[in-house]
Design a protein with these regions (language model features):
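Compact, glycine-rich, soluble single-domain proteins
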Residues: 1-87
């Protein structure tokens, strides 16, 4: 799931009502990963996960996606078939 915000900020995410673990990626305006949390379990609720720096997008994927695709901080992500978002 992709979350798109009007401006970059330190948006927090939690695992309330989730049934499975996920990876979370916070991306800047250019789609570059600025923070990530891997294999976040539903049992972490009510903890809230915040990026270290402001981000404009948050992408949630199945757990293990970051490891499988060697995604780390600084990795640029290209989202195919996504509309361009402008301010």
């Amino acid at each position: 799931m992709l979350f798109v915000f009007a401006e970059a900020d330190r948006y927090g995410f939690w695992m309330k009502d989730m049934l499975f673990s996920i990876d979370m990626f916070w991306l800047d305006d250019k789609g570059q990963v600025v923070h990530l949390e891997e294999d976040v379990s539903p049992e972490t609720y009510p903890d809230v996960f915040y990026p270290m720096v402001p981000a404009r997008f948050v992408l949630e994927t199945n757990a293990g996606f970051a490891l499988e695709h060697s995604i780390t901080i600084g990795t640029p992500l290209v989202l195919k078939n996504s509309p361009t978002v402008s301010k």
